[in-house]
Regions:
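Short histidine-centered catalytic/ligand-binding loop motif
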Residues: 56-78, 134-140
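Catalytic metal-binding acidic patch
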Residues: 60, 114-120
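A short glycine-rich, hydrophobically flanked beta-strand micro-motif that places a catalytic Asp/Glu
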Residues: 93-106
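Acidic pyrophosphate-coordinating catalytic loop
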Residues: 105-113
Length: 156
């Protein structure tokens, strides 16, 4: 079986887990949790342990763990938000492609299991370079704070 090797995420794996959910916390504080966009039914925030620059997580406001528990309005809003965030990433970062997905359960790769969320990960040709393999380092050329401000400005 192939494995995704992301050594820079080890800090997240080993970090003390908060009792309350990152998405629910994000609903209360915009800047502290890198929230870039909120709607009535969804919240979008930058992943602080990104697979790539611009890695955004989008979740329903309601704390549910499975897609099948969402109401139709939440599903529609989630995908409209995904489309809006993607367009914003297109303008701000100009990636060559994306990985977009949902991991449900730890066996499927979910790191946050209690609150459903989807990932949108911008990709560029050659972004799977040698740095993680040789130096246990992921090259992210922009600070989360700077990117957060740019995306907030683009989305609002």
């Amino acid at each position: 079986m192939d494995r995704l090797w992301a050594p820079w995420r080890y800090a997240y794996v080993k970090a003390k887990k908060h009792k309350n959910c990152i998405f629910c916390r994000g609903l209360k504080s915009k800047s502290k949790n890198y929230v870039i966009y909120k709607t009535k039914y969804s919240i979008s925030l930058l992943n602080i342990f990104p697979y790539n620059n611009g890695h955004v997580m989008i979740s329903p406001v309601r704390h549910v763990k499975d897609f099948s528990l969402l109401k139709e309005a939440e599903i529609v809003d989630l995908f409209k938000t995904l489309n809006k965030v993607k367009k914003s990433l297109d303008k701000v970062l100009k990636p060559h492609g994306y990985n977009i997905g949902i991991n449900i359960s730890p066996d499927a790769g979910a790191g946050i299991t209690g609150h459903l969320h989807l990932h949108i990960v911008p990709r560029w040709k050659g972004d799977t370079n040698f740095m993680p393999v040789l130096f246990n380092t992921k090259v992210i050329s922009q600070s989360l704070g700077e990117l957060c401000r740019k995306l907030q400005n683009e989305l609002c």
